[in-house]
Design a protein with these regions (language model features):
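Extracytosolic ligand-binding ectodomains
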Residues: 1-282
């Protein structure tokens, strides 16, 4: 689709999070893992936690997360003490988890304990990891679990082993208001991707009021003022990726708690009442 749209000089707003398809008229609204890794590693390092272990799926997302994890740990002056990858199968993670556990215990016994265990991914692999943490004898009271935005799924807090984990994501209050309004109107919960669809419509609406020759031009799409949607402030960049204001969240038994509010992008934030009106489906 992108080549056809490019020939017609029509920009494409994609829900993808694969930055390899960004650019040349394609702009990604999806949450990209690279800034998420930078946000969570930076937050942890600010709290004096600089010795890391990582358990990463050997898949496309894992490769991106792993490469950026190495880069960000080096940037903050940290050390990756242990790193294991695992095949994305139901039973593939147990042996790598046991290996990580052994390395964590060895570091503790050697007087240089590991501070945080990085486990990027989403619900499918995190539920498996959560179930296996006790078998692998990894004590999450001593080693802080950290992840990416994939931890932001319903009922993550039902798994006691994931409670207390830290991850980056948008301020959940915008999504909660959106989901409540959606459920009231349609008697069902919205899929998580619905916020991206809503934000895409919001973006289009914001730009549609300009002069006909100015609508949806690269300059307007990447305007410094950015946009504000259900998932907070965001700015489209000339390379097709998206800069977002990400908070640091903590998995709690019921929902997520905000540990560190979204970092400012220098964009004006609308009052909560404005967002509430915007997501009214009645």
């Amino acid at each position: 689709m992108a080549p056809v749209a490019r020939q017609a000089n029509v920009p494409v707003i994609a829900f993808s999070n694969d930055r390899h398809v960004a650019g040349n008229g394609v702009y990604l609204l999806g949450f990209q893992v690279e800034p998420e890794v930078a946000r969570v590693v930076g937050y942890v390092a600010q709290r004096g936690m600089r010795r890391f272990a990582a358990l990463i799926a050997d898949d496309a997302l894992g490769k991106i997360a792993g490469a950026n994890f190495r880069q960000e740990v080096a940037r903050v002056g940290g050390t990756i003490v242990a790193l294991q990858t695992y095949p994305p199968t139901a039973n593939g993670v147990l042996e790598p988890m046991r290996a990580i556990s052994t390395q964590i215990r060895s570091a503790q016994e050697g007087g240089a304990a590991i501070d945080a265990l990085f486990v990027p991914g989403g619900q499918e692999n995190l539920e498996i990891i959560g179930r296996l943490l006790p078998q692998a004898e990894i004590d999450t009271d001593k080693v802080k679990l950290i992840g990416t935005g994939g931890m932001d799924y319903p009922n993550a807090g039902r798994d006691a082993m994931l409670v207390g984990a830290w991850y980056p994501g948008p301020d959940p209050r915008g999504w909660n208001e959106f989901a409540q309004s959606y459920a009231k109107s349609y008697a069902q919960s919205p899929p998580r991707i619905a916020s991206l669809a809503f934000d895409a419509v919001t973006l289009a609406s914001a730009l549609a009021g300009g002069g006909e020759d100015q609508r949806f031009t690269p300059a307007e799409l990447t305007r410094a003022a950015g946009f504000t949607g259900v998932d907070g402030a965001f700015r489209l960049l000339p390379n097709g990726t998206t800069e977002r204001a990400l908070a640091i969240l903590e998995v709690q038994q019921f929902g997520a708690g905000i540990l560190d509010p979204p970092q400012s992008l220098g964009l004006a934030q609308p009052p909560a009442s404005a967002l509430s009106r915007a997501v009214n489906f009645d």
